[in-house]
């Protein structure tokens, strides 16, 4: 499988600041990856510090003065990578409640809804379908600081909100789960996408309650507890405005066929 992905952003820097981007794909062992990444401020290239994190997360950090910053990223991935590695630390960390996936508020609720499926891969299908049936995908319906509880009460959200609710439900029934930002060929409307990963029967398996893109062609960008760990842009000082964002993600040939009951790993 060949996948071409990319992102173009234009950021107006209103006051000097420090920016961190997570738009570059994570390492994909045993695949062929070619990529380019540039940062241009008022026509002049600037350098970013690449910081490597857990799960292959790649943060590109820079201090920028007032001006207009253009970010251009493109990557081609040929083949599929190995399944995500497993560590005991991760299995502990991803059982815990986090800022946007408040699993501790769902313990009784999740046990009632999904208690019969806790020891089965059927759980993933049930949680995905449950979240998908409870929420409406409505761009602009949620705030960046909304968590899983807010999403369930609102009955609407975008991909990050679906992922947070899936993760919270899974953690609440003692299944390690985390959020992953991805490039998603076939997604409409095209954007950065967020999905959940759950640890079941020895593997990290992807769950996407939105059903907006086939899981088999997803490309991993960043992995973490919730959206706070995987944001494509973090601003740490001055004021900025995101004036443009275009995301692309395509496969060579037909998109894979997906079914909610299929067990899929991000590759």
Locate the predicted segments by residue.
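Intrinsically disordered, low-complexity N-terminal segments that are enriched in acidic
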Residues: 1-80
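Secondary-structure boundary elements
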Residues: 13, 71, 77, 81, ...
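Short, charged, solvent-exposed linker or helix-capping segments at domain edges/interfaces
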Residues: 21, 83-89, 208
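Generic structural "secondary-structure junction" signal
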Residues: 21, 64, 79, 116, ...
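Glycine-rich, small/acidic residue-mixed loop/short-helix segments
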Residues: 23, 27, 31-37, 211-242, ...
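Short, surface-exposed, polar/charged, turn-prone segments marking secondary-structure boundaries
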Residues: 34-41, 47-51, 66-68, 99-104, ...
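Residue-level signal for pocket-adjacent positions within structured domains
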Residues: 57, 90, 147, 202, ...
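Hydrophobic/aromatic-rich core segments of domains that either
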Residues: 129, 161-241
């Amino acid at each position: 499988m060949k996948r071409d992905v990319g992102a173009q952003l234009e950021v107006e820097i209103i006051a000097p600041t420090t920016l961190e981007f997570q738009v570059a794909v994570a390492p994909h062992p045993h695949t062929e990856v070619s990529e380019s990444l540039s940062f241009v401020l008022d026509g002049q290239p600037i350098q970013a510090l690449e910081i490597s994190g857990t799960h292959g997360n790649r943060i590109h950090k820079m201090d920028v003065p007032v001006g207009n910053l253009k970010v251009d990223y493109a990557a081609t991935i040929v083949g599929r990578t190995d399944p995500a590695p497993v560590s005991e630390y991760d299995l502990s960390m991803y059982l815990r409640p986090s800022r946007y996936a408040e699993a501790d508020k769902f313990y009784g609720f999740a046990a009632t809804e999904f208690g019969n499926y806790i020891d089965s891969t059927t759980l993933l299908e049930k949680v995905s379908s449950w979240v998908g049936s409870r929420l409406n995908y409505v761009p602009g319906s949620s705030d960046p600081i909304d968590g899983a509880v807010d999403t369930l009460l609102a009955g609407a959200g975008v991909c990050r909100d679906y992922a947070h609710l899936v993760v919270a439900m899974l953690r609440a029934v003692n299944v390690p789960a985390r959020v992953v930002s991805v490039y998603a060929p076939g997604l409409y409307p095209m954007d950065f996408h967020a999905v959940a990963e759950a640890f079941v029967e020895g593997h990290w398996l992807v769950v996407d309650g939105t059903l907006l893109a086939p899981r088999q062609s997803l490309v991993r960008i960043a992995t973490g507890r919730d959206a706070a760990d995987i944001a494509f842009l973090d601003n740490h000082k001055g004021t900025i405005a995101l004036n443009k964002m275009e995301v692309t993600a395509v496969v060579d040939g037909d998109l894979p066929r997906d079914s909610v009951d299929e067990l899929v790993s991000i590759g």
